[in-house]
């Protein structure tokens, strides 16, 4: 079954399951658009949640859909996190930080260090300012049911 057929010049991002639907990112280079599509497996209906101009970001390197709420983000090689949808915001990050998810007014990142011993940290930043609120030892793990565990 192929609910959303591909065309030449398109890139499909990794799908998410959100609100009982499969959410897909489609970067359509010939059309110069980024589309966020929703597929309802029960009704087989496809709807467009957002159509964004390709020019919304300087490149499509590491474009990803994240939660919660549903967001389109780009984590570039310049140590920034760009939220491109549903609003536009940019945050500075540390060198090895990786964005995982948003929960309310908090952004959750993971980072790692080798100084000289290897260790992982969870970095919690303020959504409005990007300032670090907390650093905790450990990693974040998402269970098959969608729960997120902090493991030390």
Report residues per predicted region.
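Generic detector of ordered secondary-structure context
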Residues: 14, 111-114
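Short small/polar-residue motifs
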Residues: 12, 59-61, 96
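Short coil/turn segments that connect the beta-strands within blades of beta-propeller domains
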Residues: 19-20, 67-70, 104-106, 146
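Blade-loop segments of beta-propeller domains
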Residues: 2-19, 23, 53
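Charge-rich, low-complexity terminal tails
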Residues: 57-68
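Surface-exposed loop/turn elements that mediate protein-protein interactions on large endomembrane-trafficking
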Residues: 1-7, 30-56, 72-99, 113-152
């Amino acid at each position: 079954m192929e609910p959303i057929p591909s065309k030449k010049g398109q890139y499909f991002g990794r799908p998410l399951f959100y609100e009982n639907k499969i959410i897909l990112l489609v970067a359509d280079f010939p059309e110069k658009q980024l589309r966020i599509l929703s597929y309802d497996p029960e009704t087989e209906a496809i709807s467009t949640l957002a159509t964004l101009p390709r020019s919304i970001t300087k490149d499509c390197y590491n474009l990803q859909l994240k939660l919660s709420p549903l967001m389109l983000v780009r984590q570039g090689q310049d140590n920034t996190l760009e939220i491109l949808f549903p609003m536009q915001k940019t945050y500075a990050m540390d060198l090895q930080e990786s964005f995982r998810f948003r929960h309310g007014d908090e952004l959750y990142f993971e980072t790692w260090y080798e100084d000289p011993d290897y260790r992982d940290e969870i970095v919690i930043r303020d959504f409005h300012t990007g300032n670090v609120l907390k650093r905790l030892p450990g990693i974040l793990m998402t269970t098959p049911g969608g729960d997120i565990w902090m493991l030390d």
